[in-house]
């Protein structure tokens, strides 16, 4: 195995370990803003996937997103009994949005931001952070609506009509904070890690 392939393997494994910890230890996977803003608890695992995709490229980013999806599916089936677990028991909902985060963010960075100056790249990284939050949220909502409708899901608390509006109402408040968090985190962390990775020969 070449030295460069070893570097990619080590960094990929490192990001997978981070995501495993974020899934297993809840306070590592979200920012608990509830003490400041009631009900706000933005998830940040999608930004780990986004940063991995920025550093390692779309293919490995999609793989790491798929790993998060696998953990999500496992968690949904191992701890049933809530609407959240019911949503992610559908493998399409668990996998597709997470894979798309890695794929789209990795492709976008390599195509439009890889060789840009610091200022432009900072703005672009912030945009990609917000986009990662949107891809994950919109994907989960749409696939949940499709899954619940096709399977005619009947569960306490799930309405029989206007399922899309109900789901949007649930996620929209948190989504605002996730987008803001993504803009800040991905821009800040990306600007630190991208130059380090590039000096080490890691260029997507």
From Swiss-Prot:
Keywords: Cell membrane, Membrane, Transmembrane, Transmembrane helix, Transport. It is a multi-pass membrane protein. The keyword Membrane applies. Coiled coil: none annotated. The keyword Disulfide bond does not apply. One of its GO terms (cellular component) is plasma membrane. Probable pantothenate-binding protein that interacts with the energy-coupling factor (ECF) ABC-transporter complex. Unlike classic ABC transporters this ECF transporter provides the energy necessary to transport a number of different substrates. The substrates themselves are bound by transmembrane, not extracytoplasmic soluble proteins and transport it into cells. Upon coexpression with its energy-coupling factor (ECF) ABC-transporter complex EcfA1A2T in E.coli allows pantothenate uptake; uptake requires both PanT and EcfA1A2T. This is Pantothenate transporter PanT. The gene is panT.
